[in-house]
Amino acid sequence: MSRILAVSASEFAIARRNRWVFMATGIMTLFALALTFAGAAPTGSLGVDLLTVSVASMTTLSVYLTPLLALLMAFDAIAGEAERGGLALLMTYPVSRGELLLGKFAAQLGVLAFAVMVGFGAAGATAALAGGAGAESLAALARLIGTSILLGGAFLALGYAVSAVGGSSTGAAGLAAGLWLVFVVLYDLGLLGAVVFDDGGTFTRTVFPWLLTVNPADAFRLWNVAAAEGVALATGMTGAASALPAWAAPAALILWPLLALGLARIAFGRIEP
């Protein structure tokens, strides 16, 4: 454990020196506040408070932005170290590859968690002060922050995996961009095409909701929508969420970081420094 903490402290210092802490926090805060002010108009027609609408908007924001920030932080973690010669030096220390990976993961997840808490917390506080907030909307905000951190953890670990197999920083960057595109954009487009083709058949009613849990981005969205009636009303995503048991989306989102870390460890084990 002490070796993992030592690696984590070193990685966090590097992230702070490279301005990742400030950039990630600034980007998250800027977009969250912009969506909060932009979403103030429809609250009256929906019959929910401003914080609920803001949480619904920030849920959509997090689906796109959190994986992107996570992959930007992670794609260079192994490939970049190998190119700069730092990986060979690290391998001479009394630390295993698993401990090295966990140390990097803890540090970068801490950076991402800080950005999420500050960004969404500031936007949530602004919405609550401007338009009021109930107990359900406050719980939805807390859940959004927690699930965004889980989502970020999944994509950080996936970023380490592509960093290990990319061969170079350039190759890893291309794989990371493709990974983001597949999970965040193309997967849903493919499912949408299948639903349209099925025209309300068996696939739409039984298979489609479960396929959403296969994707961590969709599992994140389903968890936040299914757990709060107000957020479901603001997003309109009630059909797929109601077709699944309550544990399905949470279980998928919790398992994804563990699965992705396992894949990253296997890929990292094949790297020769």
Segments the model singles out, each with a brief description of its role:
Residues M1-T25, R270:
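Aromatic- and glycine-rich beta-strand/loop motifs that create alpha-glucan
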Residues L5-I14, G47-L51, S96-E99, T238-A241:
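Cytosolic juxtamembrane amphipathic/interface segments immediately preceding
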Residues A34-F37, G44-S62, A107-T170:
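Secretory targeting signals
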Residues A41-P42, V48, L181, V185-P250, ...:
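Terminal transmembrane helical anchor/hairpin motif
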Residues S57-G80:
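Long, hydrophobic alpha-helical segments
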Residues P67-A74, A122, A157-L158, Y187, ...:
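Hydrophobic/aromatic residues in alpha-helical transmembrane segments
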Residues A77-A113:
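Helix-loop-helix units of permease transmembrane domains in multi-pass membrane transporters
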Residues I149-D199:
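A structural motif at transmembrane helix-loop-helix junctions in multipass membrane proteins
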